């Protein structure tokens, strides 16, 4: 289980502290360090409850040189990883930034810090995605209203389309971020158990976004499918390696995790019209997921 948090409690609405060369004053850095210590304490508490802590950011990954930036918004991702213990990063709206290069440089920096400096397995989620993004981050489709069948209907071809576009690392909110309904949420857990990534985005919906919100029978259904997802993880990891264009010996190098039917059955004309059906993972182990 992963909890995405913000943690800036020091330096509220304090500005300045930027030297002529663009570096930060000791006081400015001290505010960042104090916030990282708060993160470390939260991470320790979360870990004791079986929850890993990640970070949701709309900021640069290092303290910027803008005198107008409030200190509580400053970041030092290297310290957040090495001291705070964060290994997951979700980049949000401000990461559209100047455009293409801003997002790619940001997620690559995060990837390098987590993997090279700290030697952890990274989990980087971004709402931005262009050619090259698939090397470092998954792409999240979210901020929609759940509680209706249309939410499921348009996400199935979205996943297929993203996979065909070269980014197999796709996920979205469970039953949306707004609204919510027990039956729709259960169906969303069912089909998304056969997708690369699942996210609960809580705090804006009519109901809490969690697999146990509505009680049984929905909790039992969600639990069963999440257990299936856990059992499938070795296959999903293997297929993810294949999707990154590496040979796993399964004769599927370069194929995505969510596969349009015509990728598996190119000689079948009918397969080209199946916009609501896809092949998941390894053909020899799994039949088609038909939705």
Short names for language-model regions:
Residues 1-291:
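Catalytic-domain carbohydrate-binding cleft regions of carbohydrate-active enzymes
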């Amino acid at each position: 289980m992963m909890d995405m948090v913000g943690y800036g409690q020091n330096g509220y609405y304090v500005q300045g502290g930027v030297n002529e060369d663009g570096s930060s004053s000791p006081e400015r850095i001290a505010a960042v360090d104090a916030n990282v210590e708060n993160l470390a304490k939260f991470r320790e508490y979360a870990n004791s409850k079986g929850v890993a802590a990640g970070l949701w950011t709309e900021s640069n990954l290092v303290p910027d040189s803008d005198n107008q930036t409030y200190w509580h918004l400053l970041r030092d991702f290297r310290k957040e990883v090495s001291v705070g213990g964060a290994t997951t990063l979700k980049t949000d709206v401000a990461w559209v930034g100047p455009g293409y290069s801003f997002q790619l440089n940001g997620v690559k920096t995060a990837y390098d810090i987590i993997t090279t400096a700290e030697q952890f397995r990274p989990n980087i989620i971004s709402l931005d995605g262009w050619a090259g993004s698939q090397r470092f981050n998954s792409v999240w489709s979210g901020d929609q209203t759940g509680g209706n069948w249309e939410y499921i209907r348009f996400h199935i071809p979205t996943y297929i389309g993203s996979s065909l576009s070269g980014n197999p690392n796709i996920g979205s909110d469970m039953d949306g971020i707004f609204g919510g309904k027990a039956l729709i949420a259960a169906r969303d857990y069912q089909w998304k158990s056969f997708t690369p990534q699942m996210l609960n985005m809580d705090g804006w919906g009519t109901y809490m976004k969690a697999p146990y919100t509505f009680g049984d029978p929905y909790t039992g259904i969600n639990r069963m499918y999440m257990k299936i997802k856990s059992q499938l993880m070795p296959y999903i990891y293997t297929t993810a390696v294949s999707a990154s264009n590496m040979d796993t010996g399964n004769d599927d190098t370069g194929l995505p995790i969510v596969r349009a039917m015509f990728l598996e059955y190119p000689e079948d004309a009918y397969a080209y019209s199946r916009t609501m059906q896809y092949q998941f993972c390894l053909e020899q182990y799994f039949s088609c997921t038909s939705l």
